[in-house]
């Protein structure tokens, strides 16, 4: 609906966690990263993909570094790390206070390179209207609308992957972008798609009003 570089990911500041050479020398490993993550999630996490994420983390950060994400570095030129989010070790790779923005820009650049090579087609400024279901309820594509010309088009597909991002505006108070409405989530839910794990939708507590101003940032 909006340019990729205006999506809410540009507001993410923290960083990405993974085991690294420095933490390994201190006794860290992927199982400890896994334990930190599951414990931090109050044991609600589906654990197999958490372990896969911890195993893949070092390679993912290395790939992003090679794609041009300007991670902070030490005076020796190595990736700088910090502790973040209750971790036991300094696992977090970060790009100043704009990690989300830098990741988004690097990945957007790769997507546009793939489009230039004819490998993918980007539909920017198009809004998702709904799924195309056959009589058996099997998804066969989706319907989208050009928000400039108002043209409506149906796209045929073997599979439709929903990656809609956050939907924080379903709460009365939220610090999320005005585009995080959850509209796409609602449309597919109304078309019989199962919705689960709603407790993992982030409620950014800095937006909760209180008598004490210390609660606000």
Residues covered by each model-derived region:
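A short alpha-helix capping/helix-coil boundary motif
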Residues: 37-41, 87, 161-166
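Residues forming the flavin
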Residues: 1-32, 73, 97-217
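Glycine-rich active-site loop/strand segments that organize a redox cofactor
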Residues: 18-53
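Helix-loop-beta segment of a Rossmann-like dinucleotide-binding subdomain
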Residues: 43-47, 80-105, 168-172
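A conserved beta-strand/loop capping segment in the N-terminal third of enzymes
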Residues: 52-89, 211
């Amino acid at each position: 609906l909006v340019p990729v570089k205006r999506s809410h990911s540009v507001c993410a500041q923290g960083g990405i966690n993974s085991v690294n050479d420095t933490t390994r020398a201190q006794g860290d490993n992927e199982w400890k990263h896994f334990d930190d993550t599951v414990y931090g999630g109050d044991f609600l996490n589906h654990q197999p993909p958490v372990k896969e994420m911890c195993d893949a983390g070092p390679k993912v950060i290395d790939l992003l570094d090679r794609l041009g994400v300007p991670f902070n570095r030490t005076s020796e030129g190595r990736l700088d790390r910090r502790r973040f989010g209750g971790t036991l070790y300094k696992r977090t790779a970060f790009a100043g206070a704009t990690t989300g923005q830098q990741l988004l820009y690097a990945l957007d650049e790769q997507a546009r390179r793939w489009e230039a090579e004819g490998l993918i087609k980007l539909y920017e400024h198009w809004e998702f209207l709904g799924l195309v279901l056959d009589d058996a309820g099997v998804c066969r594509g989706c319907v989208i609308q050009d928000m400039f010309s108002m043209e409506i088009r149906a796209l045929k597909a073997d599979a439709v992957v929903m990656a809609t991002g956050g939907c924080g505006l379903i709460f009365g108070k939220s610090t999320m972008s005005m585009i995080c409405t959850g509209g796409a989530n609602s449309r597919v839910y109304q078309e019989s798609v199962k919705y689960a794990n709603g407790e993992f939708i982030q409620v950014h507590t800095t937006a909760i009003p209180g008598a004490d101003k210390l609660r606000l940032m």
